[in-house]
Amino acid sequence: MDVESRLSLILRYPAEEVITVEELKEILQAGYKLNHYIGFEISGFIHIGTGVVSMSKVVDLQKAGVRTQILLADIHSWLNNKLGGDLETIRRVAVTYYVETFKKIIEVLGGDPDGTRFVLGSDLYHHNDEYWLLLMDITRHLTLSQVRHSLTILGRKMGESIPLAYLVYPPLQVADVFALGAHIPHGGIDQRRAHILAREVAHKIRFYPLEVDGKRVKPVALHHRLLPALNISAKPASKEELSELKMSKSIPQSAIFVHDSPEEIKQKIAKAYCPPREVEYNPVLELLRVSAFREERKTPFVIRRPAQYGGDVEVWSYQELEGLYREGKIHPADLKNAAAEALAGLLEPVYKFFQGPGAKLLEEMKNITITR
């Protein structure tokens, strides 16, 4: 595959930003085998933002010839008091439910489930003196102001009462980039600040230098779009506010989980925010984009409508769909029905997995979330 084709795969939806595209093109042209990584907290059921959106970009990177890695961030999750701060439970869930769910979704999206390396944070850090030297070295090159700035809105608002663990978290994220040799650190757009820190220290640290053909380079940060919460009631004022209004596993009505039944998917989408003609911030349109229009269509996507309202509509691309909706030619109810059908179809193999071989994993997760 030539460089332009690889670049096109990496840059396509759901990618929203690359820092920088020029640097990405340079390291692709070098012909060097590149490493990627994306990290996940272990905190509950996996929703489609974490599962489908993130993994679709992992699959794109696989196809572009990049070594993909998923960091199961158990220590980070413990610092953030996920799953009740029970480190043993966090680790068990990470290497069972999270690994198997991600593998199944990668397979469903057309990727190689065995072609991605899964790394438990504890394993990366265990008996690894160089990692801890790297972490300390990173802290030598960061200011308190920089670390505070990299926190979420909530963290920045906490002022002097912020737990120290929250301030340890960003340097850990930065260290992970270099310890995993990740030329392409990847995450939602809400991870941008941490990746900027990694770029700022890249030429200063002494341990785990990031190189391409013996030349030290900065990590190229890849950020994908965040799926907006279904239950939002108004358009966010900024991208930063949008990051606080994304799908959240802690707010079930805001998210569609990868194990949801077709009936549950339909019920949730029926209640979703979907103003007529609104295309800039519309969760339902985003669901269609990630399910029905992720790949170039070989047959038209059909939006079913009663004959008295004009009958079925055939759509070939997301851009065409967006235009029709903006012009008021598709009713929100018809859009919601189409999104429910498309998403349920995409997730059907995942749903069947959790009804069959993955049933025990799902049951254990339900028991854990109930007791927390």
Swiss-Prot record:
Keywords: Aminoacyl-tRNA synthetase, ATP-binding, Cytoplasm, Ligase, Nucleotide-binding, Protein biosynthesis. ATP binds at K249. One of its GO terms (biological process) is tyrosyl-tRNA aminoacylation. InterPro entries: aa-tRNA-synth_Ic (IPR002305), Rossmann-like_a/b/a_fold (IPR014729), Tyr-tRNA-ligase_4 (IPR023678), Tyr-tRNA-ligase_arc/euk-type (IPR023617), Tyr-tRNA_synthase (IPR050489). One of its GO terms (molecular function) is ATP binding. It is found in: Cytoplasm. Its main location: cytoplasm. It comes from the Archaea. Its EC number is 6.1.1.1. A motif ('KMSKS' region) lies at residues 246-250. Pfam families: tRNA-synt_1b (PF00579). Catalyzes the attachment of tyrosine to tRNA(Tyr) in a two-step reaction: tyrosine is first activated by ATP to form Tyr-AMP and then transferred to the acceptor end of tRNA(Tyr). Homodimer. Belongs to the class-I aminoacyl-tRNA synthetase family. TyrS type 4 subfamily. This is Tyrosine--tRNA ligase.
